[in-house]
Amino acid sequence: MHGGGFYHVQKYTVAPEEMPAELHWFKYEAYFTWLSGFALLVVVYYFGATSYLIDPARADLTPTAAIAASLGFLIGSWLIYEALCRSLIGRSTPALAVSVFLLILASAFLLTQIFSDRAAFLHVGALIGTIMSANVFVVIIPNQKKVVADLVANKTPNPALG
């Protein structure tokens, strides 16, 4: 029950016997959460870079350089995460978990060396959110579309995609 309505959400090992008449994709929640968070990051920390993003006691950055560093961390962390997932490390859940934890820890340390405290730790959250949303956009949804296409074509879906 949520919002006055009843829902039946069930995860199948591979796929249901038949496709439901209406299929709800749980992707927009991730996309809109990231977009709204990024919009707030831009409005508060990028437009107010000299007040909120930059700490002159830590690094002598121009607003443009600080914003570039911010974007570099967000994009770079996702690229590193993707590389880890596609490497041998990605085949072992414990190894991947430790590697991602170390990535977040190293990022937090580096961010506190160049940004204000508040901006640094906000960026750690933004970094995690970026990784999660990008994973939904680049990996999860495309794979789910392949599974659905197989079901519609009466083929057996590849369980590795689910």
Regions inferred by a protein language model and the residue ranges of each:
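Polytopic transmembrane helical bundles with strong interfacial aromatic enrichment
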Residues: 1-162
